[in-house]
Swiss-Prot record:
NCBIfam families: mutS1 (TIGR01070), PRK05399.1 (NF003810). InterPro entries: DNA_mismatch_repair_MutS (IPR005748), DNA_mismatch_repair_MutS-lik_N (IPR007695), DNA_mismatch_repair_MutS/MSH (IPR017261), DNA_mismatch_repair_MutS_C (IPR000432), DNA_mismatch_repair_MutS_clamp (IPR007861), DNA_mismatch_repair_MutS_core (IPR007696), DNA_mismatch_repair_MutS_N (IPR016151), DNA_mismatch_repair_MutS_sf (IPR036187). This is DNA mismatch repair protein MutS. One of its GO terms (cellular component) is cytosol. This protein is involved in the repair of mismatches in DNA. It is possible that it carries out the mismatch recognition step. This protein has a weak ATPase activity. Keywords: ATP-binding, DNA damage, DNA repair, DNA-binding, Nucleotide-binding. It comes from the Bacteria. ATP binds at G615, P616, N617, M618, A619, G620, K621, S622. The keyword DNA repair applies. GO terms for molecular function: ATP binding; ATP-dependent DNA damage sensor activity; damaged DNA binding; mismatched DNA binding. The gene is mutS. Pfam families: MutS_I, MutS_II, MutS_III, MutS_IV, MutS_V. Belongs to the DNA mismatch repair MutS family. One of its GO terms (biological process) is mismatch repair.
Length: 932
């Protein structure tokens, strides 16, 4: 038994879209078969049935009504699937044999344009990536708005990942032979991104002609070949899926990565630039604070501003001056914002014009939006700042387009462009004539009904219409005896009525329906002409839309500045960040008003190059460091900042190593991830960079961690090619000695008040280092049981009272020196030798464990509880031991660490149950018995 003709056709079509779920049009339904049906039935909760197809077993099948397809398509695309739409390409009633069918569109996560499934304030980007030798090129397009951006650089995985993080594409198009290991890296970091592959020749085929045809501003001599290949590959994929050239993609914008502030993937996450760490939502992010935009276009543009802060002084100051002028003209700003509220999403409406999917109601929205532009232009002429004056000069009021739409379209047209009721009276004579004929015909129908009621005496008689029988006279069965014999022609019998027609009724029906059909056809043709005229002027509307979005962003920044008492920062060229009474923009919004403690900051590349911050857990060190970075980012966006005064040096890059998390799936422990991040910072930071390092070295033993932290500080300060502005928070109080030995290191700490045995964290950053961590007090605040807290205090007092001071003395390091001498007491060496094998055994048998570290205001990591060397000084003569140091020196002056004290301090009480707490206390008590 062979396949049925329909199933043969289905399989032939399916062969061309193996990676898609095929929606196969059969009558009024889209049907899915075989594996597609199984997937769709599961994802869409549809009943899975079967259909005879000529095989031994029935083909699995499920289907959806074609008129409801958008909802189902949206759900599948949101889940990451691609959908191929196969339509009937001819009228089934007129065809002989199997109906001709073909794929008219492929819908993918990166090419989806249904506004009901897109976030209005977020772009839906699709990205292409092309690699060639040691170079890479990337292009990003949003086909719903017409944006198309390209860039290139030397190939580094980190660079590509940073750009992906910045644009957050839904889909990435790659050359099919790209290394699977790199694809795995992308998927590992961005699991929700869909990956699509195309052949190498699709990136290069007819490259210059394709780009010239698509982009009005393309000049083949201005772009590197690798950039052109990336752009061409993306255009190929868009055409392959959309099956036509989209006229709203008419301009290619090349940008250089180094023209914007670089914020790497980890820093974007740690600083919560556009989404918070916990729920991955906008609330609690910098974007959440700054976004008071009134248009969807402005919301998307503000996100781009935040993702790409500027690094050139003039454009930054232009934005700041414009925001200042808005704040000095509040009434004008309010009028401007009021008009912005009436503007719809011009970019996405003209995107629908380009894809021929716009309806008349959306064009009315476009008309209303354009109608506000002359008023906005008038407001702009009242300002004096360069940015507003340039906008006023460049904005196109689009009066010709507004005039056409206002004259041609009804204010409340039909939703469907193929149902008529679109064109305004007076725009087209033929439309007016047909409408009159249609209206007169319906008046005749109404008069016929009244006449028949009077002549027959049947008050319930009515003249009705349906698509099957046309117009008819309906009389209930109770009144059939009143119907004059021979007056009507019986057409249909119902359970409670009879339906009749008359020759004159059918004659009028033909006139009315003919007029309606012709009217709908003419209105549709007129609508397409109007749509074509708008399409010819898409680039004009896009330019105006971009200016409106910029205005909206500036108004948003002014509104936020006014609401939150922000000030205008001064942008300097002195490599100095000076902030007086700075505040964290997000934290101050989520705590009661007035409770946030402001702090000063001074960081430069000379005497205050590395700010070493010590202090207890939960005191606010991480919040303070993030605050400095966010204020810097805000200033480079062109925003006012939360401070009393701010003098901001432009940074080229911001790096953070805050918090800790395991990457166990990739076989990387907390410490490994931490070291990878620190390595990335040291390799890529420059003297213009701002670096935030929090608890470097905490993921390993105290000696190892302290050594690494110390050497990182030396490397940053002593490397003449680096010397970046750095905030360095640590629990290693021994590092405070570096202020005396390394130029540029300055000690700061978080102020703590001790009142009647109670600890109060003042969250104030003060000059000087801290001398203790208050670990037990933090444990108390976290709710560890009172017996555990009290006993821990007793043990700590006993150990500290019994412990003798010990030290490791190291001479100050010198740049480029490769060795140094550590003075170690004999007792220290003996203790080290006695414990060496035990420590080695513990280290080898220890399992990597993960601790998720969040903002210090809620929780901080307590270091590893590996056994440490108990170094006691007993007054014996010191000996010298030569220690080789790899590329930089480690200098210890005093280490006062006891094995048991360290274990107590390192208890992670936030991740312990009360019973685990008691067990840990019992274990510590047993260990103290051996002290004497």
């Amino acid at each position: 038994m062979g396949l049925t003709p329909m199933m043969k056709q289905y399989l032939e079509v399916k062969e061309s879209c193996k990676d898609c779920i095929l929606f196969f049009r059969l009558g009024d339904f889209y049907e899915m078969f075989f594996e597609d049906a199984k997937v769709a039935s599961k994802e869409l909760e549809l009943v899975l049935t079967g259909r005879d197809c000529g095989l031994e077993e029935r083909a699995p099948m499920c289907g959806i009504p074609y008129h409801a397809a958008n909802t189902y398509i949206g759900r599948l695309v949101s889940a990451g699937y691609k959908i191929a739409i196969c339509e009937q390409l001819e009228d089934p009633s007129a065809s002989k044999g199997i109906v001709k069918r073909g794929i008219i569109k492929i819908i993918t996560p990166g090419t989806y344009t249904d506004s009901s499934f897109l976030e209005e304030n977020k772009n839906n980007y699709i990205m292409s990536l092309y690699l060639d030798d040691n170079m890479c090129a990337m292009s990003f397009a949003d086909i719903s708005t017409g944006e198309f951006n390209s860039t290139h650089s030397n190939f580094k995985e980190a660079v590509v990942l940073d750009e992906i993080s910045k644009f957050a594409p839904r889909e990435i198009v790659l050359e099919e032979n790209i290394k699977e290991s790199f694809i795995h890296t992308i998927k590992e970091r961005f699991p929700n991104i869909s990956i699509s592959k195309i052949k190498e020749e699709n990136f290069a085929y007819n490259i210059d002609n394709n780009l010239k045809e698509q982009f009005n501003n393309f000049n083949e001599n201005e772009y590197e070949t690798i950039v052109k290949k990336s752009a061409n590959g993306l255009l190929y994929y868009i055409f392959h899926t959309q099956k036509n050239i989209l006229s709203n993609i008419n301009k290619i914008d090349y940008y250089s990565i180094v023209d914007y502030l670089t914020i790497d993937v980890n820093s974007r996450r740690n600083l919560e630039i556009t989404e918070n760490l916990r729920e991955k939502t906008k609330k609690g992010s910098l974007l959440w604070v700054l976004d008071k935009t009134n248009t969807a276009m402005g919301g998307r543009q503000l996100r781009r501003w935040i993702e790409q802060p500027l690094i050139n002084k003039n454009p930054i100051e232009n934005r700041l001056n414009a925001v200042e002028e808005l704040l000095n003209n509040i009434s004008l700003q309010e009028d401007l914002k009021e008009d912005l509220k009436s503007i719809y999403d011009i970019e996405r409406i003209v995107g629908k014009v380009a894809s021929k999917s716009v309806n008349a109601k959306e064009l009315i929205s476009l008309k209303c939006s354009i109608g506000k532009v002359p008023y906005i232009k008038k407001y702009l002429s009242s300002f004096k700042s360069d940015l507003f004056l340039n906008m006023e000069k460049c904005i196109d009021t689009l009066e010709d387009i507004h005039k056409l739409l206002d004259k041609a379209l009804l204010d409340n047209p039909s939703l469907s462009v193929k149902e008529g009721n679109i064109i305004k009276e007076g725009f087209n004579e033929e439309v007016d004539s047909l409408r009159e004929a249609k209206s007169n015909g319906k008046k005749w129908i109404a008069s016929l009904e009244q006449k028949e009621k009077e002549e027959t005496g049947i008050k319930s008689l009515k003249v009705s219409y349906n698509k099957v029988f046309g117009y008819f006279i309906e009389i209930t069965k109770a009144n059939l005896n009143l119907v004059p014999e021979g007056r009507y022609i019986r057409k249909q019998t119902l359970s409670n009525a009879e339906r009749y027609i008359t020759p004159e009724l059918k004659e009028m029906e033909e006139k009315i329906l003919g007029a309606e059909e012709k009217l709908i056809d003419i209105e549709y043709k007129l609508f397409t002409k109007i749509r074509d005229f708008i399409e010819e002027n898409i680039d004009r509307m896009q330019k105006t839309a971009r200016i409106i979005s910029d205005i909206d962003c500036l108004c948003s920044l002014a509104t936020v500045a006014l609401e939150n008492n922000y000030i205008k920062p001064n942008i300097n060229a002195k490599d100095e960040i000076l902030i007086e009474e700075g505040r964290h923009p997000v934290v101050e919004k989520v705590i009661p008003k007035g409770e946030f403690i402001s702090n000063d900051s001074l960081i430069d590349t000379k005497e205050n190059q590395l700010i070493l911050i010590t202090g207890p857990n939960m005191a606010g060190k991480s919040t303070y460091m993030r605050q400095v970075a966010l204020i810097t980012i805000m200033a480079q966006i062109g925003s006012f900042v939360p401070a009393k005064k701010a003098n901001i040096s432009i940074c080229d890059k911001i790096f953070t190593r805050i918090g800790a998390s395991d990457d166990l799936a990739a076989g990387k422990s907390t410490f490994m991830v931490e070291m990878w991040e620190v390595s990335n910072i040291l390799k890529n930071a420059t003297s213009k960079s701002l670096v935030l390092l929090d608890e470097v070295g905490r993921g390993t033993s105290t000696y190892d961690g302290l050594s690494i932290a110390w050497s990182v500080i030396e490397y940053i300060c002593n490397n003449k090619n680096l010397r970046c502005k750095t905030l360095f928070a640590t629990h290693y109080h021994e590092l405070t000695k570096l202020e005396d030995n390394i130029e540029g290191v300055k000690n700061y700490s978080v102020s703590v008040s001790e009142l009647e045995n109670e600890i109060v964290f003042l969250r104030k950053i003060i000059r000087g280092g801290a001398d203790q961590s208050y670990g037990i007090e933090v444990a108390k605040l976290a709710g560890l049981p009172s017996p555990v807290i009290n006993r821990a205090k007793e043990i700590l007092q006993h150990i500290e009272g019994d412990k003798e001071e010990n030290s490791l003395n190291i001479t100050p390091s010198k740049e480029y020196k490769s060795k140094d001498y550590i003075e170690v007491s004999k007792d220290t060496l003996n203790t080290k030798n006695n414990l060496e094998s035990e420590i080695k055994h513990d280290t080898l048998s220890e399992t990597n464990t993960a601790t998720i570290i969040e903002d210090e205001s809620t929780k901080e990591h307590l270091s590893s509880n590996k056994k440490q060397i108990n170094c006691k000084r007993n007054g014996e003569k010191s000996i010298k031991k030569e220690v080789a140091v790899d590329s930089f020196q480690i200098n210890f002056e005093h280490i006062k660490k006891d094995k048991i004290i360290e274990e107590i301090k390192n208890i992670d009480i936030l991740n312990m149950t009360p019973m685990e707490g008691f067990n840990k206390l019992y274990d510590i008590i047993n260990k103290t018995k051996d002290i004497d």
